[in-house]
């Protein structure tokens, strides 16, 4: 049965994730389709969801206003896989601070019991690339692109740490929920998107 994978298109790196998912599905020869989604009705029809990088405050506020945040919570809590990238990972958190301004009052989905710091590696001009390994999910020597990237300082015991960089947690997993500080859609390496496609297909079966 075909799986529908959505990319939350309220704001952020939508087109890049579309390209990465389409290429991943083709390489894997999986029966899946990619959809750009905004409304609660569109999201409710998905089997998996990518929350892209962008401005986490904007995505959170607009998803709250249009009602999509409620549907996302319901779907994820019922088992739908979700991949939160950079700002998307911020939204997955229960608590977020900013390296410069401190405590934020932004709307969060509150899926993961983690302490997260936005812009943990610096602002736009401090963007960089670094090698990360996520050996527990079969991904090693991955070139991570970090742009105003968040990092996690602590997690609850039920969260698997997939990768660290300079002792900061930059990738996590809890069941059907995955978060990365870095932008997998900005590299030619499809490993993260392929892993997510397979997770969606396995969950749907």
From Swiss-Prot:
Keywords: Glutamine amidotransferase, Hydrolase, Lyase, Pyridoxal phosphate. CDD domains: GATase1_PB. Gene3D superfamilies: 3.40.50.880. Its EC number is 4.3.3.6, 3.5.1.2. GO terms for cellular component: cytosol; glutaminase complex. L-glutamine binds at residues 54-56, 118, 147-148. It holds the Pfam family SNO. InterPro entries: Class_I_gatase-like, PdxT/SNO, PdxT/SNO_CS. The active site is at residues 86, 183, 185. It catalyses: aldehydo-D-ribose 5-phosphate + D-glyceraldehyde 3-phosphate + L-glutamine = pyridoxal 5'-phosphate + L-glutamate + phosphate + 3 H2O + H(+); L-glutamine + H2O = L-glutamate + NH4(+). Pathway: Cofactor biosynthesis; pyridoxal 5'-phosphate biosynthesis. In the presence of PdxS, forms a dodecamer of heterodimers. Only shows activity in the heterodimer. This is Pyridoxal 5'-phosphate synthase subunit PdxT. It comes from Nitrosopumilus maritimus (strain SCM1).
């Amino acid at each position: 049965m075909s799986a529908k994978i959505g990319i939350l298109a309220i704001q952020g790196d939508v087109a890049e994730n579309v390209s990465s998912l389409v290429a991943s599905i083709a390489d894997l020869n999986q029966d899946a389709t990619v959809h750009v989604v905004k409304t609660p009705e569109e999201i409710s029809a998905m089997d998996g969801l990518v929350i892209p990088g962008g401005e986490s405050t904007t995505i959170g506020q607009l998803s709250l206003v249009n009602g999509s945040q409620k549907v996302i919570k319901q779907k994820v809590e019922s088992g739908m896989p979700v991949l939160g990238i950079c700002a998307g990972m911020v939204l997955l958190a229960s608590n977020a601070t900013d390296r410069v301004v401190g405590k934020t009052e932004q709307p969060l989905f509150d899926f993961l019991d983690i302490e997260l710091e936005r812009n943990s590696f610096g602002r736009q001009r401090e963007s960089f690339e670094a090698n990360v390994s996520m050996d527990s999910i079969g991904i090693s020597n991955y070139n991570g692109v970090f742009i105003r990237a968040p990092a996690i300082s602590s997690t609850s015991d039920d969260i698997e740490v997939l990768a660290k960089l300079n002792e900061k947690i930059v990738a996590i997993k809890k069941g059907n929920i995955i978060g990365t500080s870095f932008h997998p859609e900005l590299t030619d390496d499809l490993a993260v998107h392929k892993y997510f496609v397979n997770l969606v297909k396995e969950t749907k079966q």
